[in-house]
């Protein structure tokens, strides 16, 4: 399971002309689900995302996590994160989970995060437009 996390001052996701998810200060999480992923990996990733210390403390040091700053999470499904780009000039998505498993684990991951912080979501399998202001910029690739 892969999460590309970005520290944001605000972010939103639209489907068509409708805003389906929006947050203020917090994290934009682009979530990719792979074939061998399961709930235990989702638990581990949620724990890491919620506790990853990438927000600045009073001394300007990255020392605080999302919960400590009262931040929010916008979670957007991103199957392209599971792409195999080793060969050729076209990505292969053979490592990605089938849509049914991916959606179940996406929803489960969102629920786990929502136990601790406010969560907004994109729309699974939709063509979305994501807007954000990356604070820093601060971006990390987490893979469990």
Swiss-Prot record:
Pfam families: Tyr_Deacylase. It is an enzyme of class 3 (hydrolase). It is found in: Cytoplasm. Keywords: Cytoplasm, Hydrolase, RNA-binding, tRNA-binding. Coiled coil: none annotated. A Gly-cisPro motif from one monomer fits into the active site of the other monomer to allow specific chiral rejection of L-amino acids. HAMAP family: Deacylase_Dtd. NCBIfam families: D-aminoacyl-tRNA deacylase. This is D-aminoacyl-tRNA deacylase.
């Amino acid at each position: 399971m892969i999460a590309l996390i970005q520290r944001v001052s605000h972010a939103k996701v639209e489907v068509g002309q409708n805003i389906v998810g929006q947050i203020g200060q917090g994290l934009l999480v682009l979530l990719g689900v792979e074939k061998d992923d399961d709930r235990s990996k989702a638990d581990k990733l949620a724990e890491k995302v919620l506790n990853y210390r990438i927000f600045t403390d009073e001394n300007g040091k990255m020392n605080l996590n999302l919960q400590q700053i009262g931040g929010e999470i916008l979670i957007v499904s991103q199957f392209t994160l599971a792409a195999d780009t080793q060969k050729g000039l076209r990505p292969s998505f053979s490592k990605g989970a089938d849509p049914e498993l991916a959606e179940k684990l996406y929803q489960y991951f969102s629920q786990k995060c929502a136990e601790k912080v406010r969560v907004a979501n994109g729309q699974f399998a939709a063509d979305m437009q994501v807007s954000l202001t990356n604070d820093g910029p601060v971006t990390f690739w987490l893979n469990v």
